[in-house]
C-alpha cells in the first residue's frame, strides 16, 4: 500500500512534470543566450527569479553573461549550508568573493547597503519563495536552512 493517496500522487506527478518542463525551458533559454556550462539552466532559473539582478548588490545581470556569474550558497557550505536550490542565488564573482564564508546578514547587515538589499529581497519574495527570502535576510539563516531542508 502506498503512503500517498491517489489525489496526492496525481498532484505530485503534475508538480514533477511542471518542474521538468521549467528546467528544460531554462536550459533552452540559457543555450539561446550563449551559455555553455552545465549549470546554465539553473543559473537562468535563478536569474529569472531574481528579476535579472544580483540580490546582494543590485547590479543588473545579463542572460548573455551567465557563464561569468557564480551560484552562491546563501548559507555557505563551510557553515553547513546544503547544496539545495533553496540555498542558491546567482551573483557576480566579486560579490561572491566579498561575501566569502558568511551569510548575507553577517556580510551586509552592518553596511549602508543593508536596507536596499532587504528591499530587493522583499520585492522578489513571490518569485524567490518565502523560505528563500527568509534565509536571505535572517540573522538565524544557519538554523533556518537546516529546518527547511531537514528530511
What annotation goes with each model-predicted range?
Residues 58-90, 99-107:
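Histidine-centered nuclease catalytic patch
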Residues 2-59, 81-84, 127-149:
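Short, charged surface segments at domain edges that flank catalytic/cofactor-binding sites
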Amino acid at each position: 500500500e502506498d503512503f500517498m493517496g491517489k489525489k496526492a500522487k496525481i498532484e505530485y506527478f503534475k508538480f514533477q512534470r511542471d518542474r521538468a518542463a521549467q528546467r528544460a525551458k531554462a536550459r533552452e533559454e540559457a543555450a539561446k543566450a550563449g551559455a555553455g556550462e552545465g549549470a546554465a539552466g539553473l543559473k537562468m532559473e535563478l536569474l529569472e527569479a531574481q528579476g535579472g539582478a544580483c540580490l546582494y548588490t543590485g547590479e543588473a545581470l545579463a542572460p548573455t553573461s551567465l557563464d561569468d556569474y557564480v551560484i552562491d550558497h546563501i548559507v555557505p557550505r563551510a557553515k553547513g549550508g546544503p547544496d539545495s536550490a533553496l540555498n542558491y542565488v546567482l551573483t557576480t564573482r566579486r560579490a561572491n568573493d566579498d561575501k566569502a564564508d558568511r551569510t548575507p546578514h553577517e556580510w551586509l547587515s552592518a553596511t549602508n547597503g543593508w536596507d536596499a538589499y532587504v528591499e530587493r529581497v522583499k520585492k522578489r519574495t513571490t518569485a524567490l519563495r518565502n523560505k528563500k527570502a527568509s534565509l536571505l535576510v535572517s540573522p538565524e539563516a544557519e538554523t533556518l536552512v537546516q529546518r527547511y531542508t531537514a528530511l
